């Protein structure tokens, strides 16, 4: 469906979530909102005031009683005329209302993210705010909520807009020197000041890119991998961290052959902990696959917990162990000796050391992410476009043997890359990808 055709339709959808529920909210947007209101509830409510109404079918049969609200454009979420129906959240009730609305000429069910896409198309928000809203809806931890709300509040947009304006001003100075070099009111060698300001801007963007790793960890979670020899207590530790039995515990070595993952919320930070197959030499083809997966997951981990039975320690090859490693001695209840070779001593039988380990896992997660107070890039597409921006700025600064016209073009390209982040420039090809992340009704 073309963008132009879809904007001519009036769209509607359940926006309040899965049925049944106590209350259901149906959202409507488009040129026929007033017609829908008159058809379903008999009149158009006073803008922004809830009106208690009887919802009727096209034939006048009652459907339910509830609230109707009207938000005339352009001062609405989408910038168009919008309305909401608040009714009882019974499945049959909502389906009947949606069915009746779908029979009205020019009205159809909204596609995923279509309300937000219309808000973007009508200038009510930029792409970073839309992405922030998507992250806010998907947030599962307090840290994710805070980060998403920050982005949805426009902090990224303000920063990228300011950088883009600085680039445009710098380019204007260069083009003024090109066009009016003979005029007395244009300072000579103004371009030297421009290159200094661009060097500062480049440094700011590079620092901003570096902060993206912390945002990525908060958005996508930290990954902790439990490794060790068979029967080192890996599955027992996973069960403790999960607070339930997710892994089979057995005296038989090699019980765990696939990756088992649980998600923890540690101080508002999502942490994924993975139990892996015991690392050893084996003739079992299935177990070998599990060991290969364990080693691959280790390579991508933010932290590795290397477990060793303190009564029977079996070393794991050092070239398999990443830098971020905690060496944990297990079955401390069977070993009274203290040894400095282990970062922690734990016993899943008596609970020794487990609470301290969990506390330190949370401290580690908080140290990795830190306090995110300033705007940070939250998507890989932001990082890619920011890197392209830096590349063009660098070419402009260091192209001392090139004509000013070419260096000004590098600055124009840098400005365009920044504009693509916010959606101000040439982003049609990525809109479907971004807005498909929303659910129906958003």
Swiss-Prot record:
Its cofactor is K(+). The gene is mnmE. Belongs to the TRAFAC class TrmE-Era-EngA-EngB-Septin-like GTPase superfamily. TrmE GTPase family. Residues 221-366 form the TrmE-type G domain. The keyword Translocase does not apply. This is tRNA modification GTPase MnmE. Exhibits a very high intrinsic GTPase hydrolysis rate. Involved in the addition of a carboxymethylaminomethyl (cmnm) group at the wobble position (U34) of certain tRNAs, forming tRNA-cmnm(5)s(2)U34. Keywords: Cytoplasm, GTP-binding, Hydrolase, Magnesium, Metal-binding, Nucleotide-binding, Potassium, tRNA processing. It comes from the Bacteria. Binds 1 potassium ion per subunit. GO terms for cellular component: cytoplasm. InterPro entries: G_TrmE (IPR031168), GTP-bd (IPR006073), GTP-bd_TrmE_N (IPR018948), GTPase_MnmE (IPR004520), MnmE_dom2 (IPR027368), MnmE_helical (IPR025867), P-loop_NTPase (IPR027417), Small_GTP-bd (IPR005225). The keyword Transferase does not apply. Homodimer. Heterotetramer of two MnmE and two MnmG subunits. GO terms for biological process: tRNA methylation; tRNA wobble uridine modification. Mg(2+) binds at residues 235, 256. GTP binds at residues 231-236, 250-256, 275-278. (6S)-5-formyl-5,6,7,8-tetrahydrofolate binds at residues 27, 84, 124, 442. GO terms for molecular function: GTP binding; GTPase activity; metal ion binding. It is found in: Cytoplasm. CDD domains: trmE, TrmE_N. It comes from Brucella anthropi (strain ATCC 49188 / DSM 6882 / CCUG 24695 / JCM 21032 / LMG 3331 / NBRC 15819 / NCTC 12168 / Alc 37) (Ochrobactrum anthropi). HAMAP family: GTPase_MnmE (MF_00379).
